[in-house]
Amino acid sequence: PAKDLWRKMLTMLFETGHPWITFKDACNLRSPQQHVGVIHSSNLCTEITLNTSNDEIAVCNLGSVNLPQHMKDGVLDQEKVKRTVTTALRMLDNVIDINYYSVDTAKNSNLKHRPVGMGLMGFQDALYMQDTPYCSDAAIEFADRSMEVISYYAIAASSDLAKERGTYPSYDGSLWSQGIFPKDSIEILEKNRGSEFLKVDRSETLDWDQLRAKVKKDGMRNSNVMAIAPTATISNITGVTQSIEPTYQNLYVKSNLSGEFTIVNPYLVRKLKALNLWDDVMINDLKYFEGSLTEISRIPDE
């Protein structure tokens, strides 16, 4: 039965982190490129949903905003985000033209649709900087506002590039050309699935009507502009938490081809130092309990 299959999938997801579940129908309903093909599958990490065919292999060029570097006194610096995203979109668009393509089908797809994916990493770090719990209404509000800012300026940057370099070849007929943004396409899903399943906050803090008018006038350089990648490697290189994920362990060992190295939650270390609790005993306790704080009685509940 379907319920048993669904329960088994969720159990496996809870126990192992796999399989990653993505709903194909919803992806196609909201795809800005539904006029040129069908989304048959996603990539391994499921942040990319692009149409494919016998003549096209989907390719997407990714970049991630280091969110903690855009925090100022516990507040997101929107002007800095704007500058970063604007520069990043230009660089990602350049990658499409100068990239090496091992097969022509990938080159055809990338040049025809020019998708790029701006994402972020260090979301949990940004919450730490605000002393905000991940599981809180304040965290949800910050997620809404930070993603709105990145999305807004990513679309604006792509439209600026379209004015400078021209729209992507398959632009005509896309949802973009109809004035429908990704945030608007949830209404398409709502009409298909029913409003009772889509009770989500759709409040705005930026002038989206002005941006729609700009896109209608100048077009878009890229068919897609947003993608939240896992950033498993680059986040470790830059010393921030992965993507939009919470800290799942305060201390763990990561392995790669270079060997093994220990990852420690630096914010926990700072807090413990501030409480005069950071000593050799605490270090050994954290190692023994594999980063868990629940078994260490010296640490206050708050």
Language model feature labels by segment:
Residues 1-302:
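Long, C-terminal-biased catalytic regions of enzyme "large/alpha" subunits
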